Regions:
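Long, histidine/aromatic-enriched segments associated with O2/redox biology
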Residues: 1-227
């Protein structure tokens, strides 16, 4: 499966800059809110393992139930937690892991278009001339497109009531422009909410392709030679 995803990088950082003033009272508010929406810091470090360390390691070997069952580190509505809930679905960690594994897929992405800032500095990105499209070429491999990619997209990412939420779409790519939606951040003593969410990723195009297995290719090769 291939998709070309156009990303409004400047719009994302402009929204995060303005919204963070109402959510967090700290100089690092902008980076923290961005990480909450994605589920990782810009270094790739997951919030579940590194809730206060933006320079942590980019790791994938973790679950949510033991360290972050209440979502105070990585919000339930974050893009990361939606696209792979791991052990945090209903039914307990073991059952949740079994369910999640049925829908896992191998995915890779390659950016296209020039960066707004060579140093990836947020202030530079906000001041830059944003006249060139940029985004991500997204590819995923599935044994069953309906069970893996389409299920993940429709049931988890686009579901505003995912994991007990009410009107929370995916904070990056799931917010219809004509709806008043929110992003909920569990916190102690009270949760925080970002309102008037926007869509920062648009699908420009895509296609499904059939990739034969190696045994199938060998079979086709033998058939061609003997034909």
């Amino acid at each position: 499966m291939f998709r070309q995803l156009s990303q409004d990088v400047q719009g994302f950082w402009r929204f995060v800059t303005e919204a963070s003033e109402d959510v967090y009272d700290s100089p690092a508010a902008r980076e923290r809110l961005a990480a909450k929406m994605v589920g990782r810091w810009r270094s790739g470090a997951p919030l579940t393992l590194f809730p206060d360390d933006p320079d942590g390691a980019a790791r994938d070997d973790f679950g949510y139930e033991e360290q972050d069952a209440d979502g105070t580190r990585c919000p339930f509505s974050s893009h990361l937690r939606r696209s792979n809930p791991r052990d945090s679905l209903e039914g307990g960690p073991e059952q949740s892991t079994k369910v999640t594994n049925r829908h896992r897929l191998l995915r890779r992405g390659r950016p296209y278009g020039p960066p707004l800032s060579e140093a990836f500095d947020v202030d530079e990105m906000l001041d830059a001339d944003d006249d060139t499209e940029r985004g991500l070429h997204f590819v995923c491999l599935c044994a069953d497109i309906a069970r893996q990619f389409e299920f993940t997209q429709q049931t988890w990412i686009e579901n505003q009531k995912f994991s007990g939420l009410y009107d929370d779409p995916d904070p990056l790519m799931g917010s219809p422009q004509d709806e008043d939606t929110t992003f909920t951040i569990p916190d102690d003593p009270v949760r925080r909410r970002v309102t008037n969410m926007q869509r920062f990723v648009e699908v420009r195009g895509g296609a499904y392709f059939f990739m034969p297995s190696r045994p199938a290719l060998r079979f086709l090769g033998r058939a061609a030679l003997s034909g």
